[in-house]
Amino acid sequence: KFDSKIMINSKSFKQNEADHLVLINEFRALEQKISDNSARAKPKFDKRGQLLPSARLKALLDPDSYFIPLSSLAGYKIGDDDGDKNIMGGNSISGIGYVSGVRCMINVSDSGIKGGSMTQMGVEKALRGADIIKENKLPLISLVESAGANLLRQSEIFIRGGKSFANLAKLSAMGIPTVAVVHGSSTAG
């Protein structure tokens, strides 16, 4: 049993709740901008007979199961991410969901945004995901279509980006399954 002294009908609780709901709605609106940014590429994807990254994720997940997005605002207003028209979320969709009844970490290159090119904060997002995988012994599924490193920012990601490849070897050594499905180009990785 969890004991709490919170008085949910108190004026201060109601005010805190209202203030937090405003912030949550602002957060969700930013997440929606990322999704909308990716969806602008839909005509290109349709022409190539491809699904958008968000649709790939939906097709992968068990029907009626949940997906917990992680680090969805990675890189907010850093580098090329202006927080508005070019909001990127680290150029990937990452989170925990169920595939064939198994709880997994899923990472989807968001190739609808700048070809899924990797950014500094996208690398940090992937490294944080690897920590969660190791701690919770979650299988990793990656849906990959990426232009590789953003060449204009390559010096910012080269060293830390290499750690993501080392993490794959560590996961393998730990007996944690890793699966990558490549949907198009996968430059340098």
Describe the function of each predicted region:
Residues K1-V179, H183-G189:
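Terminal-region recognition feature
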